[in-house]
């Protein structure tokens, strides 16, 4: 399953932002996979922190092969040591089992997250061990498919914005200017900023000042 968007969102963004309109026309529709199972999405994002996408995919495949369905029962039955054997660090395995325990004993209302506003959902998710604000926002986008997520703390988003809008730096004030312009479809804009940052359009440059080499 891919992040759902279509003509309505594209038309709105292109009308609001000429430079982004050019990017959208060049790239076309973007397919980004989503995981609509909130429990497994939280675990998947914890695993992926500070490792490559390839390493994350390898560990995730091992986990799926080993346990099949990823839920609180299978995680708690596995325990920290078995999770470590899959290539997960001790600290992350602790975060994962703590999350599973909270879901199991209902001290974390995982179903209730879906009913909350973006701000409330981010606050709830980032109260979990191992989940910061940036990770919570990624869960909102790539699991819950919330339509208006744009993260200032995402370095690739900042890079993409510099490349699209020809800025040397994206400070908070500039970021908020674009966020307001692209709202309520910031999530779709995020997909294009990530694509640009990743080199989807050859020849586009990053306008960030080059770092001075130390003598």
Predicted regions located by residue number:
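A positional/architectural concept
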Residues: 8, 15-68
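C-terminal accessory module of base-excision DNA glycosylases/AP lyases that mediates lesion recognition
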Residues: 1-30, 119-120, 133-142, 146-215
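N-terminal alpha-helical segment
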Residues: 39-43, 56, 76-79, 118-121, ...
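Residue-level marker of regulatory loop/turn positions in helix-turn-helix DNA-binding domains and
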Residues: 36, 40, 114, 149
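Alpha-helical ds-nucleic-acid-binding substructure associated with the helix-hairpin-helix region
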Residues: 19-23, 51-52, 56-127, 181-183
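Short alpha-helical scaffolding segments that buttress acidic/His motifs in well-ordered protein cores
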Residues: 42-47, 96-100, 139, 189-193
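Short amphipathic alpha-helical interaction patches enriched in hydrophobic/aromatic residues
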Residues: 46, 79, 83, 107, ...
């Amino acid at each position: 399953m891919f992040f759902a968007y279509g003509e309505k969102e594209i038309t709105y963004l292109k009308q609001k932002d000429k430079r982004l309109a050019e990017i959208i026309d060049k790239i076309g529709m973007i397919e980004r996979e989503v995981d609509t199972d909130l429990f497994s999405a939280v675990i998947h994002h914890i695993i992926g922190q500070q490792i490559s996408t390839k390493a994350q995919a390898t560990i995730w495949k091992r986990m799926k092969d080993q346990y099949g369905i990823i839920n609180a029962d299978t995680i708690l039955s596995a325990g920290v040591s078995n999770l470590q054997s899959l290539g997960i660090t001790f600290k992350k395995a602790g975060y994962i089992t703590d999350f599973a325990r909270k879901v199991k004993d209902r001290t974390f209302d995982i179903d209730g997250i879906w009913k909350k506003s973006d701000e409330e959902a981010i606050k709830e998710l980032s109260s979990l061990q191992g989940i910061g604000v940036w990770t919570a926002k990624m869960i909102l986008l790539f699991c819950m498919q919330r339509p208006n997520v744009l993260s200032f703390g995402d370095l690739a988003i900042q890079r993409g914005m510099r490349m699209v809008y020809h800025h040397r730096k994206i400070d908070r004030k500039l970021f908020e200017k674009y966020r307001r312009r692209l709202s309520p479809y910031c999530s779709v804009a995020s997909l294009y900023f990530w694509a640009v940052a990743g080199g989807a359009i050859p020849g586009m440059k990053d306008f960030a000042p080059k770092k001075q080499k130390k003598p």
